[in-house]
Amino acid sequence: MLAETFPEGNFVVLDEGRPVGMGLGILVEFDFAHTSHALVDITGENGVEHHSIDHPWYYGTDISVYPEYRSRGIGRRLYELRKDCVRRLGKRGIVAGGVIPGYADHIDTMSAQAYIDKVVAGELYDPTLTFQLENGFEARGVIPGYLDDPTVGNNSVLIVWENPDISS
């Protein structure tokens, strides 16, 4: 359904016909005054329920690269494709709930916000959030209850990339 609804905003990387990475998303309204949400609140039950080409924000619903294909520039290229889509369509930017897998090692010693702050400051490394920061995203706080992952207290981080071609 996603490929038919918003093909210009969804990307699959192939190696000899085999999918090895993907970046998926939809266009949404996003209320920055009320950022707490679960992914299904954004996508709806069918994954595209709240998508409209008229909405101003690209919401990154999923991005992944098979482990054996990591560190080859595929993830960076997927983010570039998303940014290119946003620029081409004249959208405000990209919003997503970013997973913070490294928080599992610190959950007993600090809050999710403290962990995010330390990653942003460069004091801790998170395999996902650090990569997102290196790709121009800002961390804008914790999203509690975003996903069902007790190892990180069901927390995620709100990440935002603002299109520099669009004035606020």
What are these model-predicted stretches?
Residues G23-D62, E80, I100-L133, E138, ...:
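Conserved acyl-donor/pantetheine-binding loop and adjacent beta-alpha core of acyl/acetyltransferases
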Residues L2-F6:
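Short loop/turn motifs at secondary-structure junctions and domain boundaries
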Residues V65, S71-R87, V95-A96:
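Conserved acetyl-CoA-binding loop-helix of GNAT-fold acetyltransferases
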Residues E16-R18, V28, E68-Y69, E162-I166:
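Short loop segments at secondary-structure junctions
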Residues G9-G23, A38-L39:
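Conserved beta-hairpin
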Residues G9-F11, P56, G153-I159:
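Short beta-strand micro-motifs in enzyme catalytic cores
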Residues R76-C85, R140-S168:
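C-terminal/domain-terminus segments
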